[in-house]
Amino acid sequence: SDIAAGFISMKYGFMGPNYCTVSACASSNHGMIAAFDAIRYGKADVMVAGGSEAAVNEPSVGGFNSMQALSTRNDDPQHASRPFDKDRDGFVIGEGAGALIFEEYEHAKARGAKIYCEIIGGGASADAYHFTAPHPEGKGAMKSMRDAIKDAGIKPEDIDYVNVHGTSTPAGDIPELKAVAGVLGDHVYNVNISSTKSMTGHLLGAAGAAEALACIFAITHGVVPPTINCENLDPEIDPNLNLTLNKAQKREVRCALSNTFGFGGHNSTVIFRKI
């Protein structure tokens, strides 16, 4: 499973820490946290981290289908990924990749690198609950977010945007929103929340990298990406939450928090800040 990282190191001559993180759909978030740790602990000046996935094939589709995790809107695939909608019925497999260069700040300045933002915190936890279902009250997700906020040295009130895992599954969306509200308290009504999986599908192991990039561009462009395809909000969801439904919203984003979770109860959170 480490051939992807090994190939990149050989192609570009990277001789620092080199391995693949394997934690289902949380993998690339965990990889970014590992890269962040390597730099701040003085083990590297520059790290490349990300993820890739090409899962539109018979084994992957068959496996997830047997778990009843996939949407069955086969006649309307463009609208099948619909986080927070009362008629959501599972996720849509996406394919893609994303990679980010993490670099010690003074090192980046010295070489004149273009700096988009800074990563300031990472958190990880386990649900210790079920192989495929999240904890119904989002306990593991709350721990991951709280640990990331503590690691970043900020307050919940500093968060402007949350890119949720939001896979469009009946079991997953609401516990995550409960967790976000539990962590942010009343400030949850001041933040934008969205699931970019509504547009990309679920990139599985690459989800964290792709969604980190969505957060970074929200910071650099001052535009929060939307949650599309939500036509009828699930009645169990607080209607006062700003889920950035169906249209991007302009706002200053100083701090963005990104969640990715994986089967097996793997939870991970990264936080980026404007610089």
Give names to the regions the model predicted.
Residues 10, 100-104, 150, 181, ...:
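Short beta-strand-to-turn element immediately C-terminal to the catalytic PLP-Schiff-base lysine
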Residues 18-23, 44-52, 114-122, 157-164, ...:
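Beta-strand segments within the central parallel beta-sheet cores of soluble alpha/beta enzyme folds
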